[in-house]
Amino acid sequence: MKKYNKSIGFYGEDLSAKFLEKDGYSILEKNFNCSSGEIDIIAIKDEIISFIEVKSRFSDSFGKPKESVTCSKQGRIINAAKYYLHIKKLYNYYIRFDVIEINFHIDSSKYELSFLKDAFRV
């Protein structure tokens, strides 16, 4: 099941990246990892760097995808974002923390994508 969930996650991240590019974002990084945590997508548009968590689900039986971005997870994303900004020397940008949630339909190839800008703050 874990391998299946990972492949759904990667598929969701690919769909999200395509959505963002179509919306005018430039993708800076995908799956940025450091000791503090991981960020699914880092993108920029209009001088705003967005740190984006992607959550994909087939069912709401465990809650909405965005609900799994807990305070603890937010803290790890924030720390990873601080590290990213430091190592890339990106000091003069506005930043934002977003969530993209994707709900897949089990019986078809359709899905619903929601882009939640400014989903949480430092």
Swiss-Prot record:
The record lists the membrane-crossing segments as none
Q: Which GO terms describe its molecular function?
A: nucleic acid binding
User: Which residue stretches, if any, does this entry annotate as coiled coil?
Assistant: none
Tell me the superkingdom of the source. Bacteria
InterPro entries listed in its UniProt record: Restrct_endonuc-II-like, tRNA_endonuc-like_dom_sf, UPF0102_YraN-like
The family annotation for this protein states: Belongs to the UPF0102 family.
Q: Mind telling me which NCBIfam families this protein's record contains?
A: PRK12497.1-3 (NF009150), YraN family protein (TIGR00252)
Q: What is this protein called?
A: UPF0102 protein CPR_1677
Q: Which organism is it from?
A: Clostridium perfringens (strain SM101 / Type A)
Q: Cite the source lineage.
A: Bacteria, Bacillati, Bacillota, Clostridia, Eubacteriales
